[in-house]
From Swiss-Prot:
This is ABC transporter C family member 3. One of its GO terms (molecular function) is ABC-type transporter activity. The chain crosses the membrane at residues 115-135, 161-181, 236-256, 261-281, 346-366, 379-399, 724-744, 787-807, 854-874, 875-895, 967-987. GO terms for biological process: culmination involved in sorocarp development; transmembrane transport.
């Protein structure tokens, strides 16, 4: 899995011992790593001595190691104990507990309370650094005076004083550098701690959120908190010291400036004060824009996340353009604000960056105007102070902008952490009370704040206890799933009480699968017990499936269960519950996704067998199982209408009887005898005898069964094409203009300083000439002053142009990259999404895009500024002191190697940091999808620990990267300080010939080199790391793509297809090149308007036919023709828009009801209402506020699953296609609704060619013909009645497996079709009675295997297992897993899957049978 792919397994316990040879190799590797000090060892920093810690020398060997080896996560030291997530979580929890009691809690205050000592320590070091900065200008002034006196011959100082000055300047600079980088490291560590605790607390809170809070907070918004908002903290705290000390530095600089040049200082101060209001206005606007900007970002990420989760449905419906438009609109709104934000930020930078130049020009002009002279010592000391002033002033706008963002981010985090949490269900500890669920006089709602608008359960009295099976039934929207959720504590209790005794296991209606092996999904963190595990596989009918996977139960399932069919996912979910050995089992319609014979097996061997000693609560649509339940609860409109035993309810002749009639069950034929099928039950028991083997940890790793692709990771330097991509994507000419302005800006600033030195030199010469009675030469002082002011003002204008041009460019580039990325993903094939975790993709749209949006501009602009400044500095110093070129050559060589080693290390660390970040988001997305299961299974703490583990792996990359930054910075400062030292040295040697002005200019520039060289190098590295985001985005932009959406030369006619005939011509399909085909030479002809049923066992290829027809997977060989036209020649959009499908998984999107059924707004209101009436949702829609424009929440959570399925039918009705595919289309609705839907399909699609993939055979027995698939081939294809005459046929076997009564009913349906009789007149089967014991003599162990003559094992490989791509039949949740559905008798009713949010109900005790 993801973390293992980048070496995380080195830090986890290895549960798979493997062969001795592997262990020996591993031991050698570990010994080698320990020898060099990496991989699992304690932090090198934590174990270093004081000098090594102070100078970051502990990282030397690591840098060399990174150069020699491709860096892996396992090579990096473990985090220091004080950096680990567990420690940080404990610290912030204590602080937040104090803060939350205050009237206005603040997460930032809590963070300062938790980590305040680190801030103090950081400030201590930074204060020493700040003080050391002022030593240089003082020494510079003395050095100029020393040279002047030496040249004039009146010096009384020690001739060696220049050397002493050089040593003092070097020493003070080195002390400052050491303190600076320690301060930086502590600040970076503190920022990372804050990011970590935000991620930890947001994750912890997300698991605990109440349902009403979750309804108002989308996953995209929460992901933003963990990525963008948390990242803001890191960025601010990296620069916090610059912000804290900016004002003190400015004040000290001004004081020293006043001492040097007197009152002209106040002229500069006045200019600075005049700029304050403008800074304030810009800062206020930035705050306002940023507050709105994060909201638009949240919306964009939320919509993107929703689209990516449902990408398969969008492709099937050819809705890419509609959803692209929605995302682009939200992105454009975001970009509009981003432009505004960038322009105000540019304005703030211009004001602040121009201040040093403007102040210099104004101060020196005033100085000359008042004193009529230029003193070299004072002027260049002042110039050094102004250069020092440049840094805090330059950082001010950055800190202001980041501070604004941090404030907003902190408030968002605080608001989120203050959201209401789910209240734990009352736990009953009284040993005299039996295990079970107890609800008394309860009124419950989904959203307490909007209880009028949300579904409510009223007057609920429910009890399920002891060794009983209680079934909950009701029509679509009656409240079955809601009652199930109420038992789990997921609904708000308005009145009454909900209590529980014992531990709970929960099986949701839509199975939640984690991205791990099948075995891990079943164990779910529980200890491994071989005997119990094997028993669970048997009763959950998983043995045969596991045999077909090449890796067995170690097969990697993939994200969202992509490698399994819908039925397989549900059986894994049931197996997880059974293995947990809980006291109470709450099952929400688990049989809807499985075949009838598998459902039979699960009910009798699992629910009534192995769980017979447990309390089992089962919400279901399969009424044929009701006679076997101890109690039945009937729900209607959110209330319990009846309760009691099956026979009691029949005798009452109330709501239950009407429900049976709606389902088509003949109650009069039901036998009252409800004797238990004891022989079945007694064969199963979850208690494992003590003689079983001791428990052992399961093998978590599987090297062969990897489905999820390893995240791409480039090696070496970021390729030049990535830079070129960024330069050209936003408009190459604009970038070129901005770059030219950068060069002109540095050139004019340098010229201003040089001109001042030249003016001083000429002024001194002219003064000497006048003293000797000679005429002064050259320009007058007034002219020098005019040029000085003119060039200075020009420099300010160029700086403004540079900033506005460059920020304009970066926003354009960001817009283009997003659009290209999103469009590329919309056009990516399904195989890409099946093998790429959603969290990894979302990471591109959050962290990576945020880097391009907000950080790239600052990073590149600062690099260009510092780099050009360093080049200019070296040129100036070398011209003035040519001898400096001698030591400069080796210094440059050392510099080259230092930055080379650093860049190699830092970019690999950055890539590892990015790769190790994705699993955090993947795990988070996975957690949000299964939060109810996590709560029910009491796995909150285990998941929190997993989050901590993944966060620690990410943090050790980040902190090591920060340590590398300080390691390099200190060594670069040493080189820069050596340059200053040698400059002083050569000036001292050459003091009799060099001018004082040149001394001042050289040393003032040399002093600035220390910081500038380091910043230029770090910004170069930072720019490269930011380019990693562009690289990662571009990797997806250049990824695999589907065929063209439109082929202009092959556009179909407007009325295509005219008839709807389909021909499969020797169709061969495989999911990826090199894999075995899943369809093997499919050939058949389907006539226009023909109704075709498609059945087959799991893995037979049913869903693969759908994928091939819609070209989600392209044919490897052969062709599919529609009305004689090869579909391969059409564009995908033209093809898919002319087909229709009702998928098994009903998906709704946030927006309006209208947008969900008519996204292109092509139909009139009357048409929409007419369709809603056809699907029995007219009254429901009318009752909603807004009607057609009523709100649909994310994932359609405010509609039940059954209602969502009906809306999918509405989409097909509106499309009015010639070809319709039904992929188990009525699995999520009750029997009555199923009958209505089938009637609607027969009526409204009578002129359509219909392909029906079915688990429930009653839905296809009225088909004109049935295709029976077996191992990717057509085993049988004929009329239903004809196929049933073959006793050895696969269809005949499947029919027989539904039980005697249902088999007879299915045969009557087939005969009615043959005889032309209306099938609605055929009497459905009655419910089976226990004395029939239909399973008593059944060969349960072979229930999944048809007759040998009709299905050979070697001909039936599981396509999902063979192709670990996840694109398979499996991932479609497709009925792949079992095709004929529902037990013995529920014909239509068997419509299984009624997952309505609202549909839960449950009531158990027979004693209260007559209450209602």
């Amino acid at each position: 899995m993801e973390l293992e792919e980048v070496g995380v397994e080195a830090n986890q316990p290895n549960n798979d011992q493997g062969s001795k040879k592997q262990n020996k190799n591993k031991d050698k590797k570990v010994k080698k790593e320990k020898k060099i000090g990496y991989g699992g060892k304690k932090s090198a920093e934590e174990n270093s001595n004081f000098i090594s810690w102070l100078t970051f020398s502990w990282a030397d060997r690591f840098v060399v190691h990174c150069f020699r080896h491709v860096l892996q996560l396992s090579h990096i030291w473990d985090l220091a104990s004080y950096d680990k997530s567990a420690y940080l979580a404990e610290k912030i929890a204590i602080s937040w507990d104090v803060e939350i009691k205050k009237p206005k809690p603040s997460y930032i205050r809590a963070a300062f309370r938790a980590f305040g000592l680190y801030f103090v320590l950081s400030w201590f070091f930074y204060a020493i650094y700040a003080a050391s900065q002022f030593v240089g200008p003082e020494i510079l002034k003395r050095m100029v005076t020393f040279v002047l006196k030496s040249r004039s011959g009146i010096s009384t100082e020690d001739p060696n004083m220049g050397y002493y000055y050089a040593l003092i300047m070097f020493g003070s600079a080195m002390i400052g550098s050491v303190c600076l980088y320690q301060s930086n490291m502590i600040s970076a560590r503190t920022g990372d701690r804050l990011r970590s605790v935000i991620v930890l607390d947001v994750y912890r809170k997300a698991i605990k959120l109440s349902n009403s809070a979750r309804a108002n907070t989308s996953p995209g918004e929460i992901v933003n908190l963990m990525s963008n908002d948390a990242q803001r903290m890191v960025e601010v705290f990296q620069l916090v010291n610059n912000g804290v000390f900016a004002l003190p530095q400015i004040i000290v600089c001004l004081a020293l400036l006043y001492r040097a040049i007197g009152w002209p200082t106040f002229v500069g101060l006045g200019l600075m004060l005049a700029a304050v209001p403008f800074n304030g206005i810009a800062a206020k606007k930035l705050t306002e824009i940023r507050r709105h900007l994060v909201g638009f970002t949240d919306k964009r990420v939320k919509t993107t996340n929703e689209i990516l989760q449902a990408i398969k449905i969008i492709k099937l419906y050819a809705w890419e353009d509609s959803f692209a438009k929605k995302v682009i609109e939200r992105r454009e709104a975001e970009i509009k604000l981003l432009f505004s934000f960038s322009r105000y930020r540019a304005m703030l930078i211009v004001i602040v960056a121009a201040l040093p130049t403007a102040v210099s020009v104004l101060v020196f002009s005033s100085y000359y105007g008042y004193y009529k002279k230029l003193d070299a010592g004072e002027i260049f000391a002042a110039l050094s102070y102004l250069n020092i002033l440049r840094l805090p002033l330059g950082f001010l706008p950055i800190i202001v902008a980041l501070g604004i963002q941090m404030k907003i981010a902190a408030q968002r985090v605080t608001d989120f952490l203050l959201l209401p949490e789910m209240k734990e269900i009352s736990k009953i500890e009284d040993p005299s009370i039996e295990n079970g669920i107890y609800i008394r006089d309860a009124t419950l709602t989904w959203n307490q704040e909007k209880k009028e608008e949300s579904f409510t359960l009223k007057n609920i009295n429910f009890e399920a206890k002891g060794k009983t099976l209680t079934m909950i039934v009701g029509s679509v929207g009656s409240g079955k799933s809601s009652l199930i959720q109420a038992m789990l504590g997921e609904m708000d209790v308005l009145d009454g009480s909900v209590a529980m005794k014992g531990n709970v296991a929960y099986v949701p209606q839509q199975a939640w699968i984690i991205n791990a092996t099948l075995k891990d999904n079943i164990l779910f963190g529980s200890p491994y017990d071989e005997a119990k595990y094997r028993k669970v596989l048997e009763v959950c009918a998983l043995e045969r499936d596991i045999e077909l996977f090449p890796q067995g139960d170690l097969v990697e399932i993939g994200e969202r269960g992509v490698n399994l069919s819908g039925g397989q996912k549900q059986r894994v979910s049931i197996a997880r519950a059974v293995y947990s050995d809980s006291d109470v089992y709450i099952l929400d319609d688990p049989l809807s996704a499985v075949d009838a014979h598998v459902g039979k097996h699960l009910f009798h061997r699992c629910f009534k067998g192995i769980l017979k000693s447990k309390t089992v609560i089962l919400a279901a649509n399969q009424l044929n199982y009701l006679p076997f339940a101890h109690n039945t609860v009937v729900l209607k409109a959110g209330e319990i209408s009846e309760r009691g035993s099956y026979q009691q309810l029949i005798n009452a002749q109330k709501e239950f009887s009407g429900l049976l009639q709606a389902y088509g069950v003949d109650e009069s034929a039901v036998n009252e005898d409800v004797e238990d099928d004891k022989e079945i039950e007694e064969s199963d028991n979850i208690v494992v005898e003590e003689k079983t083997k001791p428990t052992e940890k399961p093998k978590l790793q599987n090297k062969d069964g990897v489905l999820t692709s390893q995240e791409e990771r480039e090696e070496g330097a970021v390729a030049m094409w990535v830079y070129w991509k960024y330069i050209t994507v936003g408009g190459g000419f604009l970038f070129l203009m901005a770059f030219i302005f950068f060069l002109m800006d540095t050139g004019t600033r340098t010229f201003v300083d040089w001109w001042l030195s030249h003016w001083q030199n000429e002024s001194t010469k002219n003064a000497l000439a006048v003293a000797q009675g000679l005429e002064p030469s050259g320009l007058t002082d007034t002219q020098y002053l005019g040029i000085y002011i003119g060039v200075g003002m020009t420099s300010i204008l160029i700086s403004a142009g540079r900033n506005f041009l460059f920020f304009e460019y970066t926003v354009r580039a960001s817009r283009a990259l997003h659009h290209q990325l999103f469009n590329a993903l919309l056009r990516a094939p399904m195989s890409f999404f099946d093998t790429t975790p959603l969290g990894r993709i979302i990471n591109r749209f959050t962290r990576d895009l945020d880097g391009v949006d907000n950080l790239m501009a600052t990073s590149i602009s600062q690099f260009l500024v510092f780099f050009t400044t360093v080049v200019a500095t070296l040129i100036i110093i070398s011209i003035i002191t040519p001898f400096l070129l001698v030591p400069l050559a080796p210094i440059c060589i050392i510099f080259y190697f230092l930055q080379f080693f650093y860049r190699y290390t830092s970019r690999e660390l950055q890539r590892l940091e990015a790769i190790s970040r994705s699993p955090i988001f993947s795990h988070f997305s996975e957690t949000l999808g299964g939060v109810v299961s996590i709560r029910a299974y009491r796995k909150k703490e285990e998941n929190i620990l997993t989050n901590q583990f993944r966060l620690d792996n990410n943090n050790k990359c980040y902190l090591t990267l920060q340590a590398m930054n300080q390691w390099l910075g200190l060594r670069l400062d040493l080189l820069a300080n050596l340059v200053t030292f040698f400059a002083c040295l050569f000036i001292t040697i050459d003091r009799d010939t060099i001018s004082a002005a040149n001394v001042g200019l050289s040393l003032s520039y040399a002093l600035s080199l220390t910081g500038n060289l380091n910043r230029a190098t770090l910004q170069a590295a930072d720019t490269e790391t930011k380019m990693n985001s562009v690289e990662r985005i571009t990797h997806y932009i250049k990824g695999p793509v589907e065929a063209l959406q439109i082929v202009e030369d092959h556009r179909p006619a407007p009325d295509w297809p005219p008839h709807g005939a389909i021909t499969f011509d020797n169709l061969v399909m495989r999911y990826r090149e090199g894999l075995d085909p899943v369809l093997k030479g499919i050939s058949c002809e389907i006539k226009a308007k023909e109704k075709i049923g498609i059945v087959g066992r799991t893995g037979a290829g049913k869903s693969s036919i759908v994928l091939a027809l819609f070209r989600l997977i392209e044919a490897s060989e052969g062709a599919i023709l529609i009305d004689g036209e090869n579909i391969a020649k059409f564009g995908l959009k033209d093809l898919r828009r002319n087909l229709a499908i009702i998928p098994q998984d009903p998906v709704l999107f946030s927006g309006t009801l209208r947008e969900n059924i008519d996204p292109f707004n092509e139909k009139t209101d009357d048409q929409l209402w007419s369709v809603l009436k056809d699907i029995q949702l007219h009254d429901v829609a009318k009752s909603l506020e807004g009607g057609l424009d009523s709100k649909v929440t994310e994932n359609g959570d405010n509609w039940s699953v059954g209602q969502r399925q009906l809306l999918c039918l509405a989409r097909a009705l509106l499309r009015d296609p010639k070809i319709l595919v039904l992929d188990e289309a009525t699995a999520s609705v009750d029997g009555h609704s199923d009958s209505l839907i089938q009637a609607t399909i027969r009526e409204k699609f009578s002129n359509c060619t219909i392909l029906t993939i079915a688990h429930r055979l009653n839905t296809i027995m009225d088909s004109d013909r049935i295709i029976v698939l077996d191992a990717g081939k057509i085993s049988e294809f004929d009329e239903p009645w004809t196929l049933l005459q073959n006793p050895a046929g696969l269809l005949n076997w499947l029919v027989e497996e539904t039980g005697p009564q249902n088999a007879a009913y299915l045969r009557r349906l087939a005969q009615a079709k043959k005889d032309g009789v209306n099938i609605d007149q055929i009497t459905p089967p009655i419910s089976p009675t226990p004395e029939q014991k239909p399973f008593k003599n059944a060969d349960i162990d072979n229930i999944n295997s048809p007759p040998q003559q009709s299905l050979k094992a070697e001909d039936n490989p599981n396509p999902k297992a063979l192709d670990n791509s996840g694109d398979n039949n499996n991932n479609n949740n497709n009925n792949n897993n079992n095709n004929n559905n529902n037990n013995n008798n529920n014909n239509n009713n068997n419509n299984n899957n009624n997952n309505n949010d609202n549909d839960n109900d449950n009531d158990n005790d027979n004693s209260e049978a007559g209450d209602n």
